[in-house]
Amino acid sequence: MRLADTRPPFAGLTNLSWEALASLPTPCYLLDEGQLRRNGELLLGVQQRTGCKILLAQKAFSNFNVYPVLAPYLAGTEASGLYESRLGKEELPEKENHVFCAAYRADEFAELLQYADHIVFNSPSQLAKFGPAAKAAGKSVGLRLNPECSTQEGHAIYDPCAPGSRLGTTRAQWDAAVQQYPELPALLDGLHFHTLCEQDADALALTLAAVEAKFGGLLPRMKWLNFGGGHHITRPGYRLATLEQCITETQKKYGVQVYLEPGEAWALNAGYLVTTVLDTLQNGETSLAILDMSAACHTPDVIEMPYRPPLLDAGDPGEKPYLIRLGGPTCLAGDVVGDYSFASPLTEGQRLIFGDMAIYTTCKNNTFNGMPLPPIWAMDENGTCRELVKFGYSDFKMRLGRAAD
């Protein structure tokens, strides 16, 4: 495909032929194995130069059929609970398996011990409740910290250091807990903090300084320190030198193994959502197009965050002559992807391609309004596409009840 749009989210489409594009069903997710590999190579370089270990946070990307593409580059997986931990164990059994959850369930913890080798607790009370069993099972035990250092602007929903946050343990909470349970420090092998969201290494440096100021006295006794996720390492222009300095200085100063657990960095710009225009209409001065994809169902972060995803050959409002608002077919009035400008009006049946659609899409989509789940396809480095999985009516129905025998 000859692309006039050379932005990073669409770089992998150069090997996709128009014939292959036309053969894809819509809507569909298309995973880009070449870009996954390029991201993996960059992250492997960081590990080789610093000695850190980088995990895949499956909450952002858990399409296990392409785990073999990433396997040569990652140290293991990070899970948010039992199912993700099991998935990592099943699909990457030789890799490390880390898990963090805001609160573990007593009826699941024994099974979790079968999969995870590193278990991070959110609070001293959870550490006291489950830590002894984890240690007895030979697991490496950690505690998530809240360094009370906010570096985000405009995304409070993603800020674990916001006032009143339920995520992580503050120094005051830790000190009070140790007074009550003096045995807690002996349970810990490592510490964990996760405070970033799509940020550069300067935010990490600020956060790391706050961690040292509040918890530095604990670090010499630790085996590892997990810097969490939110590091946009594979984004063009990311400050790799600053990241690597943070890693190497921390490991040298405290003698710990540093872990990172990004999700987006592994699959950044490594996926597309192909969609078709179903209808066009005019409401006053607003031109609209109804697509066969739904922001609410297929790209929920567009509404939750919110953000406006990149669209192939489209521009910002005012950049090109025709401004069109793109929306989905559901009954939700706010099921809108955003306003885009085009060189010419859109027409019914026209195909559009959204970029950077591998992350927080297939793992978060839903069937509101009975919307079908889009099939998931993969494209290799030669531009050859293959179907990984498709969904139908039974997938919609089975989530809502049990069919009669």
Q: Where do the model's predicted regions map?
A:
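Charged (often Lys/Glu-rich) extended helix/loop segments that serve as interaction or gating elements
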Residues: C246, Q257-D405
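N-terminal capping/small domains of soluble enzymes
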Residues: R2-Y104, E108, S294, F342-G355, ...
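A short small-residue
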Residues: W18-L24, G190-H194, G228
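Glycine-rich beta-strand-to-loop/alpha-helix junction loops that act as flexible
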Residues: H194-L196, L225-T234, P262-A265
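Charged helix-capping and loop-helix junction motifs
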Residues: A205-A210, R239-Q245, T275, S341
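Active-site-proximal beta-alpha core segment in soluble small-molecule metabolic enzymes
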Residues: R49-W224, C246-E249
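Feature marks short, surface-exposed loop/turn motifs that line or immediately flank catalytic pockets
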Residues: C149-T151, C197, I233, W266, ...
